[in-house]
């Protein structure tokens, strides 16, 4: 394969990846800032759902926070290696120019060393989302009190975070795809082809994360509507039963 290197495009691509890294880290901050958790509601079932949703955002393996941190490491790894390849190609070009000038071509030819560090682990992991256990309530009044104690703002805020992360991930995917296309159009060579494959892989991860985040946004937003959806009918039911004489 012929080698064709456009140094400006390598610099531009590395700059793009730095911007994408910054955006990914902002998304991590969104995930980390959620307040949704076990204190979501006085109703045990809703509390359990709040805890599970909170863990999907900020928990361990498979959580949005873990995925975004891993993804940021991948982006930073790609940016670092693009910059190193830029320097490597540039230094070799300078070496050949000096060799022709001084008539010492053999002394200027050095083996190109692989400066790439090991690629960080990335992708998606499994997460746990246990079904809440159903617990009996002493009375309708007890159910109503527990429902009305629910902090629906926590779920609404989590839904907004998921929606924002979904939109940002979609933008990141498009930027990565464009970066790979730009590199492919202006460069030829094994190293550049490998870089384009990695960037395209990262774009696919961002696309999948965007879709997953949109689904989670819809789910957790529905969670916020449960108290308002059921409390009025429960209050009406209690009012009707209260007038029944023993």
Question: What are these regions, as identified by a protein language model?
Answer:
Residues 1-243:
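N-terminal secretion-targeting helices of virulence/extracellular proteins
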